[in-house]
């Protein structure tokens, strides 16, 4: 994967992580309604951010 492809992937992952963050935030504002969704939404947010951080590291390594 070249640097431009990595940047495009990073942009998509950033959008996904941002949406996951907003979903978690929205859920927190609705509490205690839908409290049972906390683990599911938090896990999605965690996984999105793991992928984002890994992609950032890979891009930095490719640019070095």
Describe each PLM feature range:
Residues 1-28:
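N-terminal acidic leader/helix
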């Amino acid at each position: 994967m070249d640097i431009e492809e990595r940047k495009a992937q990073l942009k998509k992952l950033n959008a996904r992580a941002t949406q996951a963050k907003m979903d978690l935030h929205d859920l927190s504002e609705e509490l205690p309604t839908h409290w049972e969704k906390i683990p599911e939404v938090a896990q999605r947010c965690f996984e999105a951010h793991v992928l984002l951080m890994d992609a950032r590291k890979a891009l930095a390594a490719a640019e070095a």
